[in-house]
Structure formats: structure tokens, C-alpha cells
Amino acid sequence: MRRIMINASLCDGCKNCTVACMQAHRDTPGTVYDLDLTDIHNESRNHIEKMPDGSYRPIFCRHCDLPECVMSCMSGALSKDPETGIVSYDEKKCGSCFMCVMNCPYGVLKADTATHTKVVKCDFCMKDDAKPNCVKSCPKKAIYVEKTTDEAAKLFGINSNAVGYVVSDDEPDD
């Protein structure tokens, strides 16, 4: 299965991944040049944090093997696909209790700013059926998709059928 991998040492904090995510999920047609970055109805599903040492860390949903968000979701709005490993969100089922937000150990999930009635989370750009837009937009190739093998799963302590990311200092394979 595919995983979003992060080489944090290559990230320069440009936020192209954040803007690409917003562009991919916008409701109105247009280009990135007319994208309203302050539109609270179109929030990015990822963000970049600047660390005290000046380095940057891309923060993405890890689509965990044992996702706390799914286990704490009382309405069944969050589920993990056993085939792809992707944690999906069904807005129609969401009861807006935000237990998932409170239980995400990585602080990735958040309530939407506009209505405070739904959760904003990565969907791996499933509509595109290609590389996620954050990956396509990264000029430094700090974000990349990699097929996970059993060997990688053992090394990183992950399920080879999972989707998510691992902070890595290794160069991505092209």
C-alpha cells in the first residue's frame, strides 16, 4: 500500500503542500492564484510547524494502524479501510462530539472553523486517484508517496497495509 512519507530535513516551510491541499478541496472552480487563503470554509488538511531550532515539520494525518480517532468515534463517522489503510471521514454520520480531535495523539484533526460541526482531515486526495496534491506540489520532494513493504513495516513499526507518514532523514527514491 502507499504511504505519504516525509523527509523533514528537506522541508523549507514553503507551505506549497498546504496551498495545494486547499486548492484540491475548494468548492468553487479557479486556479491557485485566485485561491482565498483566508476562506474559513476551505481549510487545509495539513500544516507546517516551525520548530525552535528554525527547522520545519510538515504535520499530516498518519492514518494510524490503530487510530485513536476511529476508536473514539461514537457515531461511526471515522473508519479505517482494511484494504488501503486509509482513515476516512463521513461528514453525514458525524455527531460533532470531537472526541476524535481530542484523542488524536498528533494533534492533526481539528474542528472546521466555519461551523464547528465537522472534522477537517486528510483524505489522501482519493478523488484524484493519483499522488496526493501535497506530494505533487512539494518542490523539495520532502513529501513523497512510497509503497510500504514488510521490511519497512518492521523498521518503522507499522503495518505494511497502512497509509500515513514517517519522519525520515533519508533521501527519497525518484
Stretch-by-stretch model annotation:
Residues 8, 75, 91:
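Aromatic-flanked redox-active Cys/Sec active sites in thiol-based oxidoreductases
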Residues 12, 18-25:
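N-terminal signal-anchor transmembrane alpha helix
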Residues 63-86:
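Ordered, amphipathic secondary-structure segments that act as subunit-interaction surfaces
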Residues 22, 74, 105:
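A short local structural element in Rossmann-fold oxidoreductases
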Residues 5-6, 88, 121:
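Conserved beta-strand segments that form the floor/walls of ligand-binding pockets within enzyme
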Residues 27-63, 67-71, 91-174:
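Flanking helices and flexible, charged tails adjoining ferredoxin-like Fe-S electron-transfer domains
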Residues 1-9:
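N-terminal beta-strand motif that seeds the catalytic metal site of vicinal oxygen chelate
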